[in-house]
Each structure stands twice: as structure tokens, then as C-alpha cells.
Amino acid sequence: MQRTILLFVLIFGMSWHALALDKQALTDTLNALVRQHAYTESVKIHSVRVKNKYVTIRTNRALSTISLSANDVRDLRLLVSQIVLGNNQGKVTIYTDDYEIGELVTSVHQSRSKANRYTLPTTTPWVTNTSHPYSAKQGLEGKHIALWGSHGQYFHQPTESWRWQRAKVWTTVEDLYTTSYTMPFLVPMLENAGAVVVQPRERDTQTYEQVVDDSQATLKGQWAIGEGAGWANPTTHLLEGDNPFTKGRYIVEVKCDEKNKGEVIYTPTLPAGEYAVYVSYNTQPNSSSKAQYTVMHKGQKTTFSVNQKMGGGTWVYLGTFAFDSDKTNNYVSVTAAANGKEIVTTDAVKFGGGMGSVARYKQPNSFENVPSSKDLPESDVAMIDSAELLANQANAITSGLPRYIEAARYWMQYSGIPDSIYNYTDSKNDYVDDYAARGIWVNYLAGGSAANPKEAGLNIPLHASLAFHTDAGVRKDVVGTLLIYKDHDDEMCKTYPTGKSRILNRDLADYMQTQIVEDMRAIYVPEWTRRQLNNSSYAEARHPKVPAVLLELLSHQNMTDMKYGLDPRVRFTISRAMYKSFLKFIHEQYGTEYVVQPLPVNNMAINRQAETMKVTWQATEDALEPTATPTYYIVYTRTNDGDWDNGTRVTTPAYTFTPEKGTRYDICVAAGNAGGLSFKGETLSAYIAPEEKGKVLIVNGFTRVSGPEWWSDSIYGGIRPMSHTVPYGKGVNYIGEVYDFDSRNAWKTDDNCGWGMCYSDHMDHPTVGNTFDYPALHGKTLAEMGYSYVSTSVAAITSSPDSLITLSPQDYDLVDVILGKQKTYIMGTDTSFHCMPAQLQHALTHYLQHGGRLLLSGAHIASDMQGKEDAAFTKNLLHYEFRTTNASKTGKIRIERQLPNGVYTFRTEPNDTMLHTENADGLFPTEGGIVVARFPEANVAAAIGHDATAEGGSKTLCWSIMLESAHNFPALYQQSINWLMK
């Protein structure tokens, strides 16, 4: 800003009068200032009044769309004074968007007075995991946040069909794309910081669902049917106005004491898998604030305290757990209060996400979709007789899709929200109902609490809400990030029910935009575009009566934006920026110090030391956040085929345990501090066989998560065929491959959106990515074969000079290197995920030169090794060289020699079971190499072996597929191990 002042003093050193009131000169000055801050509209000056030393300027809203500090405002006034009056002594007032510019300084730059902060009285949180061995006092503990990813499938009445709300482009659709931030990243980050996060869409991708009602539960103690309604399992689809929480009953404890506590046990019958667990109950004036719930999942016990003074009559999320069919070790129970003053009620428990169950049909006087910023058309309510109503209902159809794909309108109906909330248009337009309802739903959640005391609702004290969208539009460079807030509500009131000014919406918007833009520029894209801070009347920004913003993160239509936006690392960074913006905004309101949760640990390894196992790891430094330093760690353990325990807290980056022989141990670690917990690191595994056949070291070298590969020329461009994203864990945004690569093809309709348009054949299921648990998968088969094993991250070998992991045949009879889809990936200036870095090559060379046995597998073990030194390593030590890419589309492998004859198949398409191999390398044997298996369609090698054990040398077997993608992985893996260990 100082440089801007100097520049314009030199240019416009004469007085305003000497310039003959040249409004254009002043306009140019202000526009230069605005362009330094954001990509926004041009400043237009409506009026300039000069009286003595007083200058008053009124402009359009452009100046209000940038983030301004107090220093910026001061310097701007001095600049205007210098231009208009010829000196800096003027008293300058500038109005933009009906605000004096000084009123637009946010708490990002300058703390507000206590009288202008949004605070709520301390209450018992809605849900608390009481098994967690940590707290987050300087995180978001005790805070409640409502948020949602945009859109979802909805029923389009004019065509009587279920449709996306946005276009299918660049392998995704906005309806699911924003969910790929909220579901795997943003919501867990907020929850790890201690927040309770409430969403108006299903959060579980599990399509199987079972709701166990209280009438199906096992009761211990004295319970009675409560007054009023409760949940009842629908006998058919939900039709217009149906509310399943008004069709049944709930139960309430009658009498209990410490010796004879009542208990209700809900036992499902489920196929083995992971399921979200939701509970429901009825809120009474004397409801317990600490109702005790226990989730028994594969024999592990996790306990929760639920504040039943809020949230009655809807689904309350506890967590996601692994269950199997053993009923004695898989159930949910709730225990009576036993304090004589408060009561516990219970209604039902829901396991899994399920399929959409709301059936819709065309209504009289339905109308076409109307944007959120526009007024709705006027229409009369048409009368319809009962016969016509029944006929219409008979034609009602469900989406036929998993519930997590559907729009918020339908989740609200299924979860007991009154139709006065979600049926905004009297059922004339589901699209409008959906976007209009989300903000009203926020107010219903907060109704009765200190956040919204005058409205009826669920009594949840919300501290903030977020509507998360992406935008449209095409540019050569980055479209970037827009934030929308509204300074008044539907009644034109500029304060929240708490009495605080809604200008705090601007503060939250500024925190979020600033954090996203700064983090993206620091890590990935120095030119990431900062767009406007818009004070605009969109329903999701206007309706909520708590601090609320609407985020338009990037353009899902723009190829440059999506080069970054399809990369899970970018989505992690942006989600972390959003989490940090909530953290900083809320702590600013309370005047307290925040601590940012750490990043996940790295360089993890398990070492066997006689009869004990030592787990080691390292903290990951966050260069952007000095408070994100770990002060403790949580070590999680899973044995055999069970579920994870609740963790053991340690203060140093090491953990030693004594394993039982014959028991498999899977270990992962999270880093913690006063701000909460990081994501869990990768899963390693260890096992000591009762009768040991040999010792194996499993090396996990598959660390890649990335977007697809892109290409472009002057006209055409897009995602390379047979190049898929590698999601983090489970991806929810991929719907199909791109088929329009012509940049000249413009958007016409969402069904004909031009450049970047894609298929949607994968829209109905998530796609498995890098699950970071492959040592456990390999270890299970090794244990069944009688081998002991430990495992390590590749970084513990390649990045730690003092690593405890060294490769020696005296320590390990066999080394199993997992490379999966590891491959150099270029994003901007970043080139990560090289298949076999030099340090790994050095370690393997040492091991093999001393007679070691090596199993190596990965889809790109040749194509990513074509540099001079890399190619020499594979040629001379591993006895293969690169032949071709895309060696198999059918996913067939024919065994030729060494292993038992047969044909194996592997996954080549995105699926919800295991990461696939879409473009395997074809290999060619070099001197001493043996073709063990081929891809029949290309007649090139899929596996190359080498056996020099007769001369006291090494033995290797190298597979050019992601071995884990094989449909019969255990058999193929076992045969590979058997041959190597002969």
C-alpha cells in the first residue's frame, strides 16, 4: 500500500482542483489498489464531495469485495487526500456497499472489541467420544458447526426424473465433488479438533443399512413407552410429507439406581464391513446431558456421552466402525442415567448409509428451477382430489442411488426434520427446496439454544455454518476462490439473535478466503486467484442466523483449476485451510489462543527386537503453522481380523509392545497437541509365527495420492485416457472418463456441457484409492503361510540416516517391496512419488548382492525407471527392462513357468473394493531374467524372475501390476512367496 501511495503521489501530485475534478484519475487509482488485492469488478465512483478539508466519496461495491486491514484503510484515505486535496491532511470518508470503508476491516487484521464478538455460553457438547485418550482445549472442543457439500441428486419435476444439479465435467460433478473435501478431509479434521459437525446429507457410503428400533432391542431394567411419537421403520418408500419419526414410539427409563442401571441393547444383523452408527431419542425437559452409549465393534468397545437435552427426534452420528456377524461382539447399547434427576430416552439405532428411500412425483403447478439469488415465481396452489393424489403417488420413484449421493432435501425428510423446513416451495420444485432448506435447517438446529433462542428447534448451539460449492467458468489461468456472505437475514435484520452484528459473516469469509489463498500460494500455486468477498443475497448465506458463509472454491469447469482440484493432496490442503479458518475465527471471538492440530506422522517402521516389537516414527513439520507441533502421539492397534482399539497415548515417537505368537498386529499412529489430533498415518503390521518358517520384511513404497495425468495443445486437451486419480482412502467424486477434449466446444446445457464432459457410469459407488494398509494385507497371507514378518515405510529406509531398518539377508529371508501405483507425478513444479528413488535402489542393491530374496510389485516399475541410472538398476539387478505401457486392458495374466500354471485376473476399472491397475507396464527380460507371466493380449511379460541361488546369489520376482488389484490376491501372492523361498 505504501508503494501505491508513493506511485500515485508522483503521478497525481497536483491538487484535485488542478485536475479539474478528474474523476477518472481517482477511479484508476482505486482500481489499481483493488487489483493488488483480488480479481474483482472495477471500481466506479458515484459521487465525490469536497468541502474544505472534508472529502466524501461514494463508490459501487468493488472496494467492499477485497480484504482490507486498518493500515490499508488509513493508507487509502491518505492516498485520496493527496490526489484530491494535494496534501495528506484531508478528512476522507469512503462509502462502498453502504458501508464506510473503515467498517469493513475484519478481525483477520484487527481484533474486534468484546462487545462485537460472537460467543455462546458453555454447554455440554451434543456428542463426546469418552474413549478418546486426548482432549482439544485449544482446538474446537465443545463447538458445533453445520456444513454441507453442495447439491446432490434431486427430482426434476418437469421431466419427472432424478438428475444432477450441475454438469458432468472433468470426471466429476459438483454434486459429489465438494463431498470429496468434506467427507474424507474437512469433517474429520474438525472432529479431530473436538468439534461436533452436523450435516444435512448422509455421510456414509455404505449402501447396506439396518435400523434397529427400540421394539426390536433387548431391554434390561424398567423402561416404559414415552409420550409422543418416535421412529418406526417405514414399510415402503417415504412419500410426500411422510416423517418416519412420527410413525412409532420411543422408550424412557422408569426407575434405576447405581446397582440396577437400565440398559437397552440394539443388535444388528450385518454383512461384514464398515458402518456409520447413528442413534435417536426424544428430548424432554429433564433429559440427561450425559447419556452413556457403548458401541461394541468386532469386540472393541468405544463409549460416548450424548447430551439428550438437544437433538431429539433425529439421527445423531456417533462414528464409523467395522462390524461383522458375531452378535455378541457387535451392538450398540444405551445406559440409564441413574442420578434420580435426569432421564434417558432411546428410540432407534441406524447402521450404515443405505439407499435413497424418498419417492417423488410431479406436483401440480411445479415450475422450472430458479437460481438461489433470484425471487421465486408466484403461483396458485392447485387443488387435487384424492383419486388423482393416489394416482400420482403410485407413479412416485426413488433415485435408485445410495443415500449419500442425494440432495439434502431428502436426508432432512428421512431424518425427521419437519416438512416446513425442507418443503420451501410446497413441493413445486425440489431444486429450490434443496438450496433454500439448508440455511433454514441451520436455524432449526439452533432453535431453542443460545444461538437462536426465540425459534423452536433442536437446541444445538451452532457457532458457524458453511455452504461449500464450486463455480463454473473457463479461463486459461486459475479462476480461483470466491467467498459470499450476507449482512442481513430474510427479515432484513443485520444482527444475529444473539444481538451481534452480521458483519461477522464477512470476518468468517475473510478468514476462509485468506487461509485458502495463502496456503495454496505457499504450497502449490503462487498465482492462485483471490476473487471477491461478496455481500450477496444467496439463500445459504442469507438464511442462517449464525455466522455463515458460502464458498465458491474454484471452477469445476476450468481445466487449470481442476488440474489441482482433482489432486487429493490439494484437497487436503484446502480442507485444512478451511478447518484452520473456523479455528482462528472462533478463537478470535472468544479471545483465546488456538493451536493447530499436527500433520500426520512419517517415516514409520516396526522393528523386531528378540521377543518385542518397537514401533518408531517421526513428526511432520508444518512450515505454515508454528503451533502445529505434536506434544504426544496416539498408537492404535488392531489384532487379527478385529477392529481398531481406542489408542494408547505416548509422549515420544516410539512404542514397544510384546506380541503374542500367532497374533497379527496392525499399528498406526496419530500425532496430537492441545489443538487436537492429526490424521492417522499409514498402517504397518507385524507377526511372530509359533513355528517360524522364515522372516520377511514388508516395505510399503506406495505413498502416491494424486490426480490424473493431463495433456493439452492449442485446441485440444484434457485427462489422458487410462490415467485415473489415486484417491486418498476412498474417493467419492469420480463418475466416469472424459470424452470431450475440444476446447472450442462451449457449454450449452448441463446435459451438453462441451469441453471436459464425461461419462457417469461410475457415479453410483465410491472408488477405492490408496488405503495405506497394504502391509496388513500382505501380512495376513504370510501369517497363514507360517512366516514371521515386520514392516516399514519406504521413507524409514530412504530418509533416515540413523534408521533402525537395514536390509540384510541375515535379518530377513525375504524382502517384499510394495510399489502399487507409485509413479512420478508432475503438478506444477512438484515431482513426487518416483517409483524407486536412489536411496531405495542402494538399499536393495546391498541386500541382493549379499544373496537376498526380493518380491517387488508395482504397475510402473519399468516406465518410471527409464532414466540412465534407473534403467541400469532394473536391467542389471532386477533383470528386466521397459517394453511398453498399457500392456493390458482386459486384466488377464497367464502364468508361463516357475509358478503353477493358470490364468489370473486383476481389476482395471475404478471400483469400491480395491484400487485397480489401469495401465500396467509390459516388461522384457534382460540377461538372467525369466518370463514368469505374460499379458496374453499384448504378449509381453507381466512378471520377470531371476534365480542365482545355486551360485549363492540372489533371487527376485518382479510383477508389473499392482499385485493387490488381483482378484485372487492371496493365491497369487502365496505362489510368488513359495517360489522365492524354494
PLM feature segments, named:
Residues 58-60, 65-163, 346, 350-397, ...:
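Non-catalytic propeptide/linker segments at domain boundaries
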Residues 249, 254, 328-331, 348, ...:
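Active-site-adjacent mobile loop/cap segments within catalytic or ligand-binding domains
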Residues 332-343:
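Short beta-strand-plus-loop segments that form exposed binding edges in beta-rich domains
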Residues 377-380, 384-394, 402-502, 534-557:
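Active-site microenvironments of hydrolase-like enzyme catalytic domains
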Residues 585-627, 676-694:
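Pro/Thr/Ser/Gly-rich low-complexity, intrinsically disordered linker/stalk tracts
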Residues 656-676:
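Beta-strand-rich modules
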Residues 817, 821-929, 936-937, 972:
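A glycine-rich, often tryptophan-bearing local segment used as a flexible ligand/cofactor-contacting loop or short
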